[in-house]
Amino acid sequence: PGGKTFHAADRLHGTGKVLSRDLTEYKTDLIEENKDRMCYENVEVQQWDALVEDESLLESVDVLLADLPCSGLGIMGRKNDIKYQMTQQQLSELAQLQRDILSVIWKYVKPGGEMIFSTCTLNRGENIENIRWIEENTPMRLVSIEDYLPETLKAEQEVRDIYS
């Protein structure tokens, strides 16, 4: 745990601060251990329920990485049993949980800041429908990352059309 946290900290080259939060003490302890082992001084780790608004963060974050709980259907190659355990109701509940969290955390982004919405799933409800929800329920707007991707990761137009 903490891979995205430490990547963000590396990208800051010792400047700024990365706040990494998780609901569970188990994960925050693991992230804290990795932080100490790798000597990251610009990372702070907190156990926090993302459904609870933190007034001290309102409009204060330059970049928010919303790495939310998801079904994991995009990593079935590593966790093959996921497809047999996930029901349609559970998928809907996860998408709703994501929207509930998003309704709280988008407010942390300062004007002109960015929120990166990240999932490891291919589920339309957790991805496309939640992106549409963000656009309909917050002042945030979708920005294409196409220009930032290496050529090998750029999808052909017909593939992009499937997901839009």
Predicted segments, located by residue:
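S-adenosylmethionine
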Residues: 1-164
